[in-house]
Amino acid sequence: TIPESSYGEFKNAPLTFIKNRFSPYQMVRENEDQKFDSFEVYFNTDNGYVAAKYDEEGDLLSTFQRFNDVKLPEKAKEKIMQKMGGDTQILSAKMTAVSDGWKITKEIYRVDVRSNGQTEKVKLIKEGDRYSL
């Protein structure tokens, strides 16, 4: 579990946090008598988690991230406003992301919005620099 004092850093840039604060190579050294092809490490907070998969040498293979109550990137907000109209209010957002090594390949946002007095859920997908609803 990530300490509360480090939570903001982890939530804002989870892969950077993991890269700077976790040594998979130490784990490999400490378990060199074990036979394994890969291993997973889970980084948890009250608001979400990252599951990181490493190979037998300690190199990052992939991650799966899920966070609640995230702040949407500006481009994501703009895409929602374009689609739903200017009176749209963003109520909350959840984010799921996957990476190939250290590179995020896909982000999925599930957003609760209020527009024209109605509350609805919007799914927004980011692949590369492109957002789609």
What are these regions (language model features)?
Residues 76-80, 89-90, 101-103, 124-131:
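Low-complexity, flexible helical/coil segments
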Residues 52-92:
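Long, charged/polar, surface-exposed segments that mediate recognition or autoinhibition
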